[in-house]
């Protein structure tokens, strides 16, 4: 077989050693156009780096420390400028309890059985304790006001989605037609 005859044929066999290689580059260039432009980090517009809402553990720390805006608002205008205060007083003025710290204190004040321990009773509680016949009367058991007050207190302690369930229409499964068992014919 003559190789010179094959080389002189006009068939397209692919680029030779000196041909430009632009066909594989075209998809790569198109792929680069599809990539997004470099942007700043997603949290930059949320908070500045000195706050606890930025960083690796920000999701864990957000509930533990209050925002500086909250403690400034809690101090109010009554505290005045903090520049004139001595060092120890200025530090104690800025350390307001966070909701996480308050929950921890409530939990640490509870008994080992999980029941809350109340520190001191008010004068009204002490007066009511001296009159057991009034607290055990039929009127106190059937009164709607303490029950409504207790329901409101427990309702406020529930998350919003449980509150929605409480106020939804109570429908028993027996009342719905589709839940009734029907023998098939």
Curated annotation (Swiss-Prot):
Signal peptide: 1-41
GO BP term (any one): neuropeptide signaling pathway
A Pfam family this chain is assigned to: NPBW
Broad class of where this protein is predominantly found: secreted
GO molecular function: G protein-coupled receptor binding
Keywords: Cleavage on pair of basic residues, Neuropeptide, Secreted, Signal
Cellular component, GO annotation: extracellular region
Propeptide feature ranges: 74-185
Keyword Secreted: yes
Localization: Secreted
Top-rank taxon: Eukaryota
Keyword Signal: yes
Alphabetized InterPro entries for the sequence: Neuropept_BW_pre, Neuropept_W_pre
Stored PANTHER family: NEUROPEPTIDE B, NEUROPEPTIDE W
Functional note: Plays a regulatory role in the organization of neuroendocrine signals accessing the anterior pituitary gland. Stimulates water drinking and food intake. May play a role in the hypothalamic response to stress. When injected into the lateral cerebroventricle, it elevates prolactin (PRL) and corticosterone and lowers growth hormone (GH) release.
Protein family: Belongs to the neuropeptide B/W family.
Protein name: Neuropeptide W
Organism (species): Rattus norvegicus
């Amino acid at each position: 077989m003559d190789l010179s005859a094959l080389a002189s044929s006009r068939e397209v066999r692919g680029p030779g050693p000196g041909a430009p290689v632009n066909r594989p580059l075209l998809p790569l260039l198109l792929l680069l156009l599809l990539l997004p432009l470099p942007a700043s980090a997603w949290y930059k517009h949320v908070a500045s780096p000195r706050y606890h809402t930025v960083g690796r553990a920000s999701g864990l720390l957000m509930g533990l420390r209050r925002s500086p805006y909250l403690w400034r608002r809690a101090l109010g205008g009554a505290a005045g400028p903090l520049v004139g205060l001595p060092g120890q007083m200025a530090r104690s003025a800025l350390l307001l309890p966070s909701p996480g710290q308050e929950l921890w204190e409530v939990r640490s004040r509870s008994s080992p059985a999980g029941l809350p321990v109340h520190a001191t009773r008010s004068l009204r509680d002490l007066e009511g304790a001296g009159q057991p016949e009034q607290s055990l009367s039929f009127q106190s058991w059937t009164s709607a006001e303490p029950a409504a007050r207790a329901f409101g207190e427990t309702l406020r302690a529930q998350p919003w989605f449980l509150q929605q369930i409480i106020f939804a229409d109570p429908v028993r499964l027996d009342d719905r037609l589709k839940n009734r068992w029907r023998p098939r014919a």
